């Protein structure tokens, strides 16, 4: 959050006092020439930074309507920001369990950089009704380019016995509620820096990440490496976006369903085969019964034709 260093001013021979006694004249002249070249490079770097800033200002304005589209979606997802905070590998350490319900009331989070992108930014938080305070919107403003950098915060209307005590070290906040309440100097506000430069830039990657308390450290590192686009050895790898991940899940689900359907179809065919075999068995029994009945009729007929056999 600190200002960029200014370009160095070109030195002259009088500003190299040590060289007068320790370095020969030709070497001293070359060093002075080198310093003049370095001055030109510093000026060019400063000019380049100004041009980059102008481009960044243009694209910062172009991002605004896209952020608005994102906002319309995130506000419709229950506990979106709470989940993103709790899954963040740094921010989650500042959120004790008893403060998680406050984050559940965080309906929207917005970062607004000042127009010149250098003088500061705001973090604007919109809350649903909660047990801590009556404010709907709380804003923290960070002013960076004045002679004495400062932080301004909305006056919070606390409910009874809900205001947290002032941080023991009097400098930095250790919990989210302390950070929300007290104004630390901009250059020591790590929570604000992480929110601005990481969480707000891409909250979705943390929303879909598994619960930080339920995953191993190696799994976290693997996930973060994938988001950075590198493998465990630091080599670049193709980055798979969230929609691709969701598509893979859907494909796996479809494959699983297809497998279940095939299994059910096989079972159905086996049942049909069993029914057919059972029917064939019944038909055989019926044929046997008919044959037996036919045999009895033949015997009776034979007896009727030869009555002497009966007399005997």
Swiss-Prot record:
Residues 226-312 are annotated as: Disordered. Keywords: Nucleus, Repressor, Transcription, Transcription regulation. GO terms for molecular function: chromatin binding; histone binding. Widely expressed. Residues 251-298 have a biased composition (Acidic residues). It comes from the Eukaryota. The keyword Transcription regulation applies. Disruption phenotype: Loss of function results in a suppression of sel-12 mutant phenotypes, possibly by up-regulating hop-1 expression. GO terms for biological process: nucleosome assembly; regulation of egg-laying behavior. It is found in: Nucleus. PANTHER family: TESTIS-SPECIFIC Y-ENCODED PROTEIN. Belongs to the nucleosome assembly protein (NAP) family. Potential corepressor protein, which may affect chromatin structure and/or transcription. May participate in the transcriptional repression of the presenilin protein hop-1. This is Suppressor of presenilin-2. It comes from Caenorhabditis elegans. The gene is spr-2.
């Amino acid at each position: 959050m600190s200002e960029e260093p200014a370009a160095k001013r070109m030195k002259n021979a009088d500003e190299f006092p040590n060289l007068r006694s320790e370095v020969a004249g030709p070497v001293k002249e070359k060093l002075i020439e080198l310093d003049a070249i370095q001055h030109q490079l510093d000026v060019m770097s400063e000019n380049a930074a100004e041009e980059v800033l102008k481009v960044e200002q243009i694209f910062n304005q172009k991002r605004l309507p896209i952020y608005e589209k994102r906002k319309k979606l995130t506000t419709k997802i229950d506990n979106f920001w709470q989940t993103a905070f709790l899954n963040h590998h740094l921010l989650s350490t500042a959120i004790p369990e008893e403060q998680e319900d406050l984050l559940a009331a965080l309906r929207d989070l917005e970062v607004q950089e000042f127009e010149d992108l250098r003088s500061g930014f705001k973090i604007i938080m919109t809350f649903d009704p909660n047990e801590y305070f009556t404010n709907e919107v709380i804003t923290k403003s960070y002013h960076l380019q004045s002679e004495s950098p400062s932080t301004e915060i909305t006056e919070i209307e606390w409910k009874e016995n809900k205001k947290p005590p002032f941080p023991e070290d009097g400098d930095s906040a250790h919990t989210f509620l302390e950070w929300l309440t007290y104004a630390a100097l901009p250059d020591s506000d790590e929570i604000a820096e992480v929110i601005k430069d990481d969480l707000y830039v891409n909250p979705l990657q943390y929303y879909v990440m598994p619960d930080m308390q339920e995953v191993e450290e190696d799994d976290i590192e693997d996930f973060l490496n994938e988001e950075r686009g590198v493998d465990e050895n630091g080599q670049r790898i193709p980055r798979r976006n969230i929609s691709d991940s969701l598509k893979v899940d859907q494909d796996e689900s479809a494959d699983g369903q297809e497998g279940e359907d095939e299994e059910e179809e096989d079972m159905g065919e086996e049942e049909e085969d069993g029914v057919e075999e059972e029917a064939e068995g019944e038909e055989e029994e019926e044929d046997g019964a008919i044959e037996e009945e036919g045999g009895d009729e033949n015997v009776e007929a034979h007896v009727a034709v030869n009555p002497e056999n009966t007399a005997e």
